[in-house]
Amino acid sequence: MGRMRSLALLAALSWAVSAAAHLPAQALDYAPTLRLHASAPLRLFGIHVYDAELWVSGERYVPQQAHALSLRYRRAIDAARLVDTSIDEMRRLGAADETRLARWRQELARALPSVQADERIVGLHLPGCGAVFWHQGRLTAEIHDAELARHFFAIWLDERTRKPALRVRLLGEVAR
């Protein structure tokens, strides 16, 4: 009985370690209860752009609780394109102050480097505080701007997202 119990514990720990491998270890320092909630691919015009994972602090996604998005890119994308697309989407979702958007562009330029195929960017949203970003497990930016963080994560998680099917899959909702 002891051997079976040990094997079961080892299997559970192995799963936890492999799951956590998609998040930088430091992310758990900020939000120790993060767990993988759902994952889904993003395809544009049939091209596989990235695989997204949503990590949540509780049983489900709650916007006011810490959560992380992990994006494993399937193709190379230049940093300027990542930043420009993010700013364009934040503007589309209601961020209208161009002075603020210019400041946010500078912050995101620190956070979002160019990526190659199979590289990962992780963003951790700490509601009310800001966000932390990693590329390939290396810290790229700590952003102490709660509004920037809220608008950035809205790109994927807001009801008005440009990719509602991805949002539905990440949130584990039933499509309407």
For the regions a language model picked out, list residue spans one by one.
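Bacterial N-terminal signal peptides that target proteins for export
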Residues: 1-8
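N-terminal signal peptide c-region/cleavage motif recognized by signal peptidases
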Residues: 14-20
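Terminal leader/tail segments of proteins
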Residues: 20-176
